[in-house]
């Protein structure tokens, strides 16, 4: 086992504090509408420019092991906030730095660290409750746009685009952010159920210009296995021909004789038909076929259920107003499924999302949920250069997360004002002087975000904080973008409660642990061995080679 280096009390805390400060100082320059960018060197490709706190934090690794421990603990704050709320990482870092700095001073002055931590926890739980009470629910699309705009650093076009996407796909719908191939940023909404499988043969195309197969008011046959023998399909094909409606076949695969016969019938004009492979693989394929069945009001034809293809009647087929199939995708619009059954399926998938521990499964379940609940919107972020696109994509991601959080738990005044107000309204009293000091540490820390936003905008932080606190209006604050004071909510400067709450809870949890640290252990740096004379002469006379050793 390698030798360890151990540091105690003041020495340990000072080294740790240095690490915390290095990381927090790099992150906090990005806070607020006038926050600056950070350039990160990449081992390959162009440097990355970002204003996203967690991206900056994740890049920082310090040489000194003890300083690095402090930095990594604060990095954990940013990552945790990012995982839960998706935004507010810089605020969380600023709060954590302030609590650690003030806590360090208090411990150095001889206070009991455990009591300080109790005081910190008391104050934080009171502030979280107060934020919940002050929250204002979001009702209009304009309010959604405001949240998005603030989080995208005052970029109104991003806010509007996110509001439009949410309006179209609903709060359950999935909104994804991709890099565009052009310089324009655009929004594309896919309504209905879309999956990434195209037609099995180009002969199924109905619109040769666009190379798509459009089926209006179609029947949909969902089959779990491969279809290679046409004989079993004849009864159902004949029944569909009688109705003169088109048919879409979704199965694991259609091959050989079956595919050839379908194509020939299509070309002769007797049968309006198209076939696609089922989406997904393994168990997920079964689940997705079930989803399509519920959406279209049909049944999955499966040997497991004892349903044979020969016995399938029209009543087992799904129905949809329109099906559009391109080379890569199939979209089913307006399925004939019952509302109650779709709702039941949505609730079931939500339950699975709650229970799963794998991020990958969660993402896939969320996609399925969106396809059932309303559709998928894609925001394609464009820019003149790759570096610009990446920077903008970071902001759009943040804005999207903030908007979701706002819809979930409501909004409070932005610009650090909600926390600043909370600092003046903490009523909790500690059981002793040290706990009271812990409560005061949180009081001071709650002012840090508003002060940092002001100083990043070139204003004097103390004057701004003083002016805001003098005015008793709950939403009165400082607009760093214009340099004016006024009602933050009226000016559209709002923060999601979830983001502010998560930032404070995560910051206090990690900072509280750092304050109570008394010893630190890290691997000792390896000492380089002096002069290399030993191996050379060993073979000579006995120990003759030792001459090179430098005692």
Swiss-Prot record:
ATP binds at residues 30-33, 51, 87-91, 415, 495. It is an enzyme of class 5 (isomerase). Its EC number is 5.6.1.7. The keyword Cytoplasm applies. It holds the Pfam family Cpn60_TCP1. It comes from the Bacteria. It is found in: Cytoplasm. GO terms for biological process: protein refolding. The keyword Nucleotide-binding applies. One of its GO terms (cellular component) is cytoplasm. InterPro entries: Chaperonin_Cpn60_CS, Cpn60/GroEL, Cpn60/GroEL/TCP-1, GroEL-like_apical_dom_sf, GROEL-like_equatorial_sf, TCP-1-like_intermed_sf. It catalyses: ATP + H2O + a folded polypeptide = ADP + phosphate + an unfolded polypeptide. One of its GO terms (molecular function) is ATP binding. Its main location: cytoplasm. Keywords: ATP-binding, Chaperone, Cytoplasm, Isomerase, Nucleotide-binding. Belongs to the chaperonin (HSP60) family. Together with its co-chaperonin GroES, plays an essential role in assisting protein folding. The GroEL-GroES system forms a nano-cage that allows encapsulation of the non-native substrate proteins and provides a physical environment optimized to promote and accelerate protein folding. This is Chaperonin GroEL 4.
């Amino acid at each position: 086992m390698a030798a360890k280096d151990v540091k105690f009390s003041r020495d340990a805390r000072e080294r740790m504090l240095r690490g915390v400060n290095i990381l927090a100082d790099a992150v906090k320059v990005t806070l607020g509408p006038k926050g600056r960018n950070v350039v990160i060197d990449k081992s390959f490709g162009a440097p990355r420019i970002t204003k996203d706190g967690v991206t900056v934090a994740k890049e920082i690794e310090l040489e000194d092991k003890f300083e690095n421990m402090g930095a990594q603990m604060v990095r954990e704050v940013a990552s945790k906030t990012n995982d839960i709320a998706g935004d507010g990482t810089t605020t969380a870092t600023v709060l954590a730095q302030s609590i650690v700095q003030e806590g360090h001073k208090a411990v150095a002055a001889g206070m009991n660290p455990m009591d300080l931590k109790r005081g910190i926890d008391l104050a934080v739980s009171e502030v979280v409750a107060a934020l919940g009470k002050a929250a204002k629910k979001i009702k209009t699309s304009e309010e959604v746009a405001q949240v998005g705009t603030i989080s995208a650093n005052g970029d109104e076009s991003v806010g509007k685009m996110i509001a439009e996407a949410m309006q179209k796909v609903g709060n359950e719908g999935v909104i994804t952010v991709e890099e565009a191939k052009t310089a324009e940023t655009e929004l594309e909404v896919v309504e209905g159920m879309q999956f990434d499988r195209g037609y099995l043969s180009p002969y199924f195309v109905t619109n040769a210009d666009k190379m798509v197969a459009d089926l209006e008011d179609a029947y949909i046959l969902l089959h779990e296995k491969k279809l290679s023998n046409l004989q079993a399909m004849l009864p159902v094909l004949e029944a569909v021909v009688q109705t003169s409606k088109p048919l879409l076949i979704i199965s694991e695969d259609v091959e050989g004789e079956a595919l050839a016969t379908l194509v020939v019938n299509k070309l002769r004009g007797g049968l309006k038909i198209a076939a696609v492979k089922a989406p997904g693989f393994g168990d997920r394929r079964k689940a997705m076929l079930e989803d399509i069945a519920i959406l279209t009001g049909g049944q999955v034809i499966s040997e497991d259920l004892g349903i044979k293809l020969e016995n399938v009647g029209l009543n087992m087929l799904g129905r949809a107003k329109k099906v559009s199939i391109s080379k890569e995708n199939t979209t089913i619009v307006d399925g004939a499924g019952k509302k109650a059954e779709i709702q039941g399926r949505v609730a079931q998938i939500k339950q699975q999302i709650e229970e799963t521990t794998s991020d990958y499964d969660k993402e896939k379940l969320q996609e399925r949920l969106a396809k059932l609940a309303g559709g998928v919107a894609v925001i394609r972020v464009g820019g003149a250069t790759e570096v610009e696109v990446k920077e903008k994509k970071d902001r759009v991601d943040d804005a999207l997360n903030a908007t979701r959080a706002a819809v979930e738990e409501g909004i409070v005044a932005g610009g650090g004002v909600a926390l600043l107000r909370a600092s003046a309204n903490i009523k909790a009293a500690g059981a002793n002087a040290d706990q009271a000091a812990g409560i005061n540490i949180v009081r001071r820390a709650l002012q840090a975000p508003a002060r940092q936003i002001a100083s990043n905008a070139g204003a004097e932080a103390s004057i701004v904080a003083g002016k805001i606190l003098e005015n008793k209006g709950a939403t009165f604050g400082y607009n760093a973008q214009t340099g004016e004071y006024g009602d933050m909510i009226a000016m559209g400067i709002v923060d999601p409660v979830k983001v502010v709450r998560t930032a404070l809870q995560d910051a206090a949890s990690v900072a509280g642990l750092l304050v109570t640290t008394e010893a630190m252990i890290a691997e000792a740096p390896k000492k380089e061995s002096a002069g290399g004379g030993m191996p050379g002469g060993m073979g000579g006379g006995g120990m003759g080679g030792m001459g090179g050793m430098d005692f």
